[in-house]
């Protein structure tokens, strides 16, 4: 069971692979803990699949937490809008902290200040991102574990949370850009059965007690890794932006200009600029989508992917081999763009419904995609450009951890410039802004804490008001559902109740979801992305308080099925578990921003 979630990663995989092994923690030996966890698993292996939630906790999860070094207190209440909510475990660094916390059980804020993390446990291999209705092994019915852990983190104010079904372990961070959709998952059983100590070391380092303990600087191991990941993303983003402005854009645009120039024919600089911008963002989009597994990199698509092409180019560059003056790479890319646009059943690629890769309607010679079909770039130009976009300091760039601040700022910055053609025949061009400056200016970024403050104080009052209206509607929906259970009602009465119920459900969906956010000067979209993340997390808290007969949860289930049916109509099979409600909800919110 290899975990392939489509969530945004909590840490940079590049940082974990290349920087973490240089840390003091990496030099520690995980083998004693590995042997204890493996012995625990082997002793219970034949029973685990038949155990309910409480039994799974007793036989496997509690012993595992103890092996990982935690002291814990089970089920301490936290209030969510007046509703009692209980994270399964409050985790402590040592027995002394646990003992001190016992005396503060009735003082929620004081109690949770002593907690290093919370944990939520489910029965063995229970799906962690979906409602499991009418499952006898669940203690609480109609709950979504990923909704629960996000709500508990926000409700308690604890920064770190563990969600597990015994096999899959997820790490959540309250201060992530989106508490619900960013997490770090690991398959413990796969690690134990493979006897791969190097991979197990990641699990041990990130889920043991010591990972949550603050050092003399007030930061724990997880926070240091998170900061290191963010620093890496910032450095890569700055390098990419510098390369795009100083080399890449001019090399691409100059290549187009040199190819289309004919005696007596003027070259339209604005069209070359727009086509180059479109081409560049197709490449960045694919690097990002492939790194995030938004395209099926685990299937035959990989051999056709941009990442694979970039790896082949890197090998040739490192071996100092020559590239052709023909257009082999460009033609491969155009075919790849068309595959993304039209889909390819045999490769497991669905149709992309955006306009970025759509060529069929680009009949006008003034459209960028028509331009890209009409002209080409040689391998000698494209190969080094792709390599610069693909590698940083000799290693593949971790595009999965880059965000709107890094990639969006490139696009935002380019919009301030125009293309100047110095010599059309040789393809000499440069970028210049309205002031005549050639060098990319330093863009001003609103600090994250200010963005979060503005978004929160703008949207929170609206959500608070909407939730009160939603609460009233949910009360009416609950009453109608109870009335419909009366077997003595006539068919006419039942039909009338069903019609009224449908109206109330639509109203409830509209109340919570019809919140439109507009940023007229959006730039890179930083504010809108924060608004989407904020709304998603807040809506998850609200939905978690109403797990029964919830019309929005019902709508998300219908949306999932609609996507699955649409893909099947294209001949593409998709594991439904990959369409998590958190991501579907985020998609709904995004469409309104």
Task: Please identify what each model-predicted range represents.
Residues 1-160, 175-181, 220-229, 234-238:
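A short, conserved, highly charged catalytic patch centered on acidic carboxylates
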Residues 73-79, 145, 179-184, 299-306, ...:
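Flexible phosphate/Mg2+-sensing switch loops adjacent to catalytic phosphate-binding sites
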Residues 126-130, 419-423, 540:
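Short acidic/His/Gly/Ser-rich catalytic and metal-binding motifs that mark active-site loops
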Residues 1-50, 139, 167, 183-537:
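Preference for the N-terminal adenyl/adenosyl cofactor-binding alpha/beta module
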Residues 115-117, 160, 511-513, 591-592:
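Core residues of folded domains in eukaryotic genome-function proteins
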């Amino acid at each position: 069971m290899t975990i392939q979630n489509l969530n945004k990663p909590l840490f940079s995989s590049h940082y974990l692979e290349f920087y973490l092994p240089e840390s003091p923690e990496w030099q520690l030996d995980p083998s004693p803990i590995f042997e204890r966890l493996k012995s625990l698993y082997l002793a219970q292996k034949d029973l685990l699949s038949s155990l309910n939630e409480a039994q799974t906790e007793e036989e496997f999860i509690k012993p595992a937490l103890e092996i990982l070094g935690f002291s814990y207190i089970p089920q301490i209440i936290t209030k969510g809008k007046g509703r009692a909510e209980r994270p399964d475990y409050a985790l402590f660094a040592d027995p002394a902290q646990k003992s001190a916390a016992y005396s503060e059980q009735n003082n929620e804020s004081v109690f949770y200040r002593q907690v290093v993390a919370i944990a939520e446990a489910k029965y063995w291999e229970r799906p962690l991102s979906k409602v499991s209705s009418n499952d006898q092994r669940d203690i609480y019915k109609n709950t979504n574990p990923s909704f629960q852990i996000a709500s508990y983190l926000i409700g308690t104010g604890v920064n770190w949370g563990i969600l597990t079904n015994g096999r899959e372990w997820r790490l959540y961070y309250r201060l992530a850009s989106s508490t619900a959709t960013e997490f770090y998952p690991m398959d413990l059983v796969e690690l134990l059965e493979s006897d791969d100590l190097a991979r197990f070391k990641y699990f041990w380092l990130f889920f043991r007690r010591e990972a949550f303990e603050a050092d003399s600087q007030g930061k724990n191991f997880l926070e240091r890794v998170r900061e290191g990941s963010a620093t890496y993303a910032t450095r890569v983003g700055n390098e990419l932006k510098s390369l795009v402005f100083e080399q890449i854009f001019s090399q691409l645009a100059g290549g187009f200009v040199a190819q289309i120039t004919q005696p007596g024919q003027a070259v339209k600089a604005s069209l070359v600029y727009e086509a180059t911008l479109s081409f560049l963002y197709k490449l960045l989009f694919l690097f990002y989508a492939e790194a995030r597994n938004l395209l099926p990199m685990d299937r035959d698509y990989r051999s056709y992917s941009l990442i694979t092409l970039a790896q082949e180019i890197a090998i040739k560059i490192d071996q100092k081999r020559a590239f052709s003056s023909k257009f082999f790479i460009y033609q491969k890319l155009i075919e790849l763009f068309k595959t993304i646009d039209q889909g390819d059943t045999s490769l497991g690629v669905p149709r992309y419904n955006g306009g970025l890769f759509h060529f069929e309607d680009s009949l006008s010679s003034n459209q960028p995609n028509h331009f890209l079909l009409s002209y080409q770039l040689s391998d000698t130009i494209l190969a080094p450009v792709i390599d610069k976009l693909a590698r940083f300091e000799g290693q593949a760039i971790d595009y999965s951890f880059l965000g709107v601040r890094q990639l969006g700022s490139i696009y935002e910055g380019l919009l301030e410039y125009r293309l100047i053609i110095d010599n059309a025949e040789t393809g000499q061009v440069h970028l210049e802004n309205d002031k005549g400056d050639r060098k990319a200016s330093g863009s001003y970024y609103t600090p994250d804490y200010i963005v979060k403050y503005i978004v929160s104080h703008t949207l929170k009052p609206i959500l608070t008001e909407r939730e009160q209206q939603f609460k009233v509607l949910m009360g009416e929906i609950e009453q109608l559902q109870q009335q419909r259970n009366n077997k003595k009602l006539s068919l006419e009465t039942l039909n009338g109740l069903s019609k009224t119920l449908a109206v109330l459900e639509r109203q409830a969906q509209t109340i919570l979801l019809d919140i439109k956010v507009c940023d007229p000067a959006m730039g890179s979209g930083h504010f809108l992305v924060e608004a989407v993340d904020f709304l998603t997390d807040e809506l998850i808290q609200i939905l978690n308080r109403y797990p029964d007969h919830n019309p929005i949860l019902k709508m998300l289930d219908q949306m999932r099925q609609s996507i699955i049916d649409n893909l099947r109509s294209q001949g593409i099979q998709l594991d439904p578990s990959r369409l998590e409600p958190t991501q579907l909800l985020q998609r709904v919110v995004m469409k309104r921003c």
